[in-house]
């Protein structure tokens, strides 16, 4: 309980110390890196007590004073005479950082800092702290007033008179911009564009101080105005600005300067002043029991120590704070309960060859170790109880201690002698304490939880690759637009490789390791690799769905036969095939626009010498019979037409006429397909003669009337629809 309370207090102290700063001027600029937290704060502060508050000023004025006690006017403008503004500087806090450096809180204030900031603040080019032992620190822009600020910075201390002090190269540098009245005034008054404050060396002794009181005393000790005559007597050679403006600035500088450019030296304690760790003692002993072989008391010592205790003959490795107890084991001779050993130690702890408070002729004293023994509190006759401490070596045992030593029994006594080792300030002392018999029984229970693997499915060593599947009835010259199968394409395309596990899934005995042969197939090539893994069962299944629309009809390309009388046939039903005359070629069909702005289209190609048109129910077909004496077969053509339309036979053309095609189109809006009739022209021979049948005017007039009625009916139907 006491140890836990001390830990909580230390943790709270550490958390609060990380944010502890002690500025004297309000806000503080913290430039200590965050990766170096403080180890301890509030180190004792010291300063050079031999220097009075006005000592530096008085010394400087004494150097520039003449015999009659007045200050020479010629000293103004001389470099080094007026080296800086009158300023107060105090270190208000020091802390040790984790990397061995120190963090200090500095406070700086010039005389009439508000007026100086108003007159020169905007003309300050650089404000920095140098000589800290680390990188320079820029304060300009990080502090509101360059003439009054507080900053927390990291320094590498110098040892002076046993204390850590500011480095001898510590500087506060203020640099001003050029080509302005302010610069001319600064240069005229100080002889330079820079004002540098440096640290004094410790002359005699250092003493403690109160930071706030010392800072206020320095501020009140600023010197009074210097007694001067007219400022016009100052040398203003090369100054291009008005003398009035320059005079005002020089008046302010005269008010706040005393010829001092040095800072007091400040020191602090180098080490943290922390109390020594306290020691606690926990004692346990075994319960009373009888044994025919031993009568020595058994004792257990628990030591909390912070420094090593060495012995001439043995040593044990470093132990950590562990509280353990052994499981009771009973020998045939007795049934004494187990002994608990509690060890809280952070340094090696060894025991001398023998430290027995009580001895008997037949057993060794408790807490003694023999060079041949490896268990704590054991004797050649196994008289002292033993305890096992997992993962830790108990103090006052030898290096060979094993955590699985068997327990032995001894006779319990009414008193127990405990040796307590107390360490403080790098010194340790031992004391013996006699206590009563206290039996502490403890037991450790170890729970091991695991999830057994009940089934192992081996990964198959081979896979089947499915080849490319194309849609059936697909011609090599064209791909049907109706096909939507993702894998039906030209022969050059290939379907993705599908891996299908082969072999049944079986249950095998659980193994600790599994060597898996992985066969990877890609781009018609497979490779095998072996991988050693733990027993991991992964069951996965890939389902590949292939959807395609088969092509039910294939139309082969038909080549035209030259110098041949063989008829060309087509597989379209309800179509008659007509023989082709020698040396005859079918002209291309011409599509005439349908009546009532209904276009007549034909989308299927026609083979040479053959006309393919769908047959319309109720159509009347009239063959056209040309007279060709030398032709091998007359060209007979089937021309289905729409219902109610009559086709007139057409006589062959004269020998001198060219090939023409006449088409008769009948269109019914929305329901009747377009019917085309093609009339081929036959090349006549030299001796051929033709007979032209006469057509009566009555017959032609009848045909014209029918066509007129049909056109009128079709037009009326189209208008009504």
Swiss-Prot record:
It is a lipid-anchor; GPI-anchor. One of its GO terms (cellular component) is fungal-type cell wall. Residues 697-721 form a propeptide. Induction: Expression is negatively regulated by the TUP1 transcriptional repressor. Also regulated by EFG1, RFG1 and RIM101. Induced during hyphal growth, during mating process, under alkaline conditions, and by farnesol. Repressed by fluconazole. Pfam families: Flo11, Flocculin_t3. The GPI-anchor is attached to the protein in the endoplasmic reticulum and serves to target the protein to the cell surface. There, the glucosamine-inositol phospholipid moiety is cleaved off and the GPI-modified mannoprotein is covalently attached via its lipidless GPI glycan remnant to the 1,6-beta-glucan of the outer cell wall layer. Residues 278-410, 453-510, 555-666 are annotated as: Disordered. This is Cell wall protein RBT1.
